[in-house]
Amino acid sequence: MTKKRGDGELVQVGELPMMKQLAKKLAPPTKAQQEFINAAVVIRTDPDAVERAFMARQLVLCTLPHSDPGDANPRWLRRTGNSSLIIQPGWDGQEDKSFGYPFGSIPRLLLFWITTEVQRTKNRENMTDLEKRTLQLGRSLNDFMRAVGLNPYTGGGKRGDGKRLHGQMDRLFNSRITFQQTAEDVNIKGRHSLNMEVAPESELWWDVRQPAQGSLWNSWIRLGEDFYKALVLLPVPVDMRALRALKRSPLALDLYAWICYRSFVIVQKQQPPQFTAWEVLMRQLGTDYTDPDNFKKKASKALAKVKTIYPGLSIGKAKGGFTVHATRLAVPQKTVTTISS
């Protein structure tokens, strides 16, 4: 069937903008979209069957870069309110160059895994402090990829999860992280700084080209003492099932952890819906963005995904921002410890 153009030419009905838009809406979901839908169904069908994971509160309130900052600057800074996160990259002695900054979804998934392992072993009386700070990564890269929520079957090429994971591990484990907080009163001004090596000692024996093949030796990392202490205190509980569903978007991962933190306080204190301004959220989680309208657009899409995989969460529209309300925790109360607001 055809329709006349204004100049008398004919055009296929399927080429009309309205029909293209309708066809797009009716198109079958992509593989990634179907995986997200399946994950959401599982979580909503049994919301209490959580796979407990944690993130350090400081890394929820100030987050890593979304994209690669490059090597032009000797440090990367994110500031929100009176809190700051500063990252300095490590140096590769073999290549005589910077490892670069950790960025994107993968170092976030690594930090979720690290914080969760720290919480799992922190109270074991049969382990020394050094043993608690030493995390075993295993002999197989494939097994570790599954543990952090990645797909071991994406191949060993440049864009495969294995290659990207190995590169981001180098970036994260060799970096130095600083948390800073300032306090100011009428007569006094103070600042607290905590400078930390992430993993001052590590051994990685995996072959990215053969990720399924086990090595003769275990791979492991030893967390810096101060970094370990920071991870132990006041972690934010999250559901690993949701992390796997959101892993393609660093912004969605950041927003999910932030929503879990906000919702914990809302549910515990039975608060009404809490307002957040887009401008404030952009300063906190979106410093990679330069256009506020673009950030709002991307954050709105990410929040819609978070709402889909968080039963009991409500996101409302408000002038200049949005409201957050929750009727339940992302992780059931009986499985979490109290976090400070």
State each model region's role:
Residues 1-341:
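Charged, alpha-helix-forming regions
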